[in-house]
Regions:
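C-terminal scaffold of the Radical SAM
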Residues: 1-191
């Protein structure tokens, strides 16, 4: 497995990703790689980038959605909307990507179980092969931390976040996703 991520690699020109893949090819690192993933942000990926990714052998996308609620996305500083995500997802499918992960988050400011329910309904309808669900970790000196400190934002309490997690787990399992790691759920064969 090769994973190009740890941020938003889709923000840079695809030619740089192409160069990375060429170097890996030179070192024979691609010979045994069955899965080559790149993280993409719906606000920074284009149809041209997706075409390039597919052409150079990337066969899995991890799309950082986080929530289908545009107000929550704005609150956490995301540059995309749910509609941007849908466009990216459809473009990826049209380019032949048959293995897509969607990242969701729980424990976001002002998030409720009803928000999680709505996100899960919309995402499971799309039938991605993989869904990752992460809890928000508030980092020091970030805009979210500053707004929490002055009372402009509120995080769900621990019990609500725990209930969100169990709700997600149950809904995804009912929709045919196998829970194989703490934050990861996949259709059979995509673990």
């Amino acid at each position: 497995t090769i994973y190009i991520g740890g941020g938003t690699p889709s923000i840079i020109d695809a030619k740089y990703i192409e160069k990375v893949m060429a170097k890996l090819q030179e070192k024979n690192a691609l010979i045994t790689a069955k899965e080559i993933t790149i993280e993409v942000n719906p606000g920074t990926v284009t149809e041209e980038k997706l075409k390039t990714y597919k052409k150079i052998g990337i066969n899995r996308l991890s799309i950082g959605l986080q929530s289908t609620d545009n107000n929550i996305l704005k609150t956490i500083g995301r540059i995309h909307s749910y509609e941007d995500f849908l466009n990216t997802y459809k473009l990826a499918r049209n380019q032949g990507f048959g293995n897509i992960n969607v990242d969701l988050m729980i424990g976001l400011p002002n998030q409720k179980i009803s928000d999680i329910k709505s996100s899960l309904e919309k995402i499971t309808e799309l039938k991605p092969e993989h869904i990752s669900v992460y809890s928000l970790i508030v980092e020091e000196n970030t805009p979210i931390e500053k707004m929490l400190n002055i009372g402009k934002l509120e995080l769900p309490d621990e019990e609500l976040e725990r209930n969100m997690y169990w709700y997600v787990k149950n809904v995804l399992e009912l929709n045919g996703y196998k829970h194989y790691e703490i934050s990861n759920f996949a259709k059979e064969g995509y673990e």
